[in-house]
Amino acid sequence: MAQHDFAPAWLNFPTPPSSTKPFLYSDKHSEGLGRSDCAFNVNRQRHSSSDAFDSAIGRPHGGNLAKREKIAWRPQSRAGAEPTWQRDTSPHPYSMKSQLHSENNTSEIDLPRKVDREERKMFEVEDFSSLYPEHERGKNSFAAGLWEYPVSDRSRSSQMLGIKKGVKDDFSLSGYSIAAGNQSLPGKHWAGIKKEECKSLTKESSIGSSFYQDCPHEKYRPNTSLHAELLAVTPCSLEGEEDTNLNNRNGSCPERDINLNFDENKISEDNGNTLMSGQISSAYPPDGVLSSSLEAEFRLLREMGWQEDSENDETCAPLTEDEMKEFQAISEQLQKNGLRKHVFLRNALALDLFHDSVQKEDSETSSSSDTSDDE
């Protein structure tokens, strides 16, 4: 036993020899009672002054004297054995059987805890799938996603490369931001698209890319408004509009017509895609843009009923010198008439006021003469 802080320095407790016999205890209750008995015996040995001194010499026992033996009473075990008197070898007598029993109990207790922890984690993963992308990735690897029968990640990446190539060539697939360089598109944008839709999109993108590659840059200009789209026609002659429309639908001729341009823009708005039709280069001035726009305006005016030959129309003819002189004379006469009329009105008003005042004076004189006659 080690020395305690509250014990005096001259008090030494001898340590009993260790024995090779293992203690056989059946449960933890008996083990706890054994511990309490050991503690009681140690306290009794510590506080009794008669045990610590030799009766003949009157000094405390040294470490070289006979070692003190301690007797402890053990309770009855489950097997029905009678209490035995045994010698304690250590202050904490743990048996091998009790240790194995405690280890089994702890393993049995930890197992349901581990299962509960795993179940709780699974619930969290299912409820908050965005916080656990690894679980979602593993789950999607078994389920059919964009392709109905995915073979491997390599094959899926090769198929996506074909789609991305068509997207980079054509800008008609809006709604999906195209990054610069070789940056790949996120897979979540393609999760809700079916296989047939993807095929149609790639087909449209390949047609659009070949169309833009075949067309020269000078024959296009950016259409920034609806008015520009209505007036944007090609330098082709008006007689060959049907041929250009047919060739444009086949994708072989670079010339575009106003009707085809408007139809394509309308279809793209219905699909939710913003087609950048003809917006390739704004730095180069297009050839024949002014003449084509004027021709389109003239054609629209003719369809609305406007007549181009206005030589016989007298209302549109310019004024001659005689007509200008006549106009000036008429305007001067009107101004003079206006001044005369203003002067006449002013004089007439003055005459009316004078006439009224004269009538009032006459009435007053007549009334005064009448009163004088009555008197």
UniProtKB/Swiss-Prot annotation:
InterPro entries: Vasculin_fam. Residues 96-108 have a biased composition (Polar residues). It comes from the Eukaryota. Residues 365-375 have a biased composition (Low complexity). GO terms for cellular component: nucleus. Residues 49-109, 356-375 are annotated as: Disordered. Its main location: nucleus. GO terms for biological process: DNA-templated transcription; positive regulation of DNA-templated transcription. It is found in: Nucleus. GO terms for molecular function: DNA binding; RNA binding. Keywords: Activator, DNA-binding, Nucleus, Transcription, Transcription regulation. PANTHER family: VASCULIN. Functions as a GC-rich promoter-specific transactivating transcription factor. Belongs to the vasculin family. This is Vasculin.
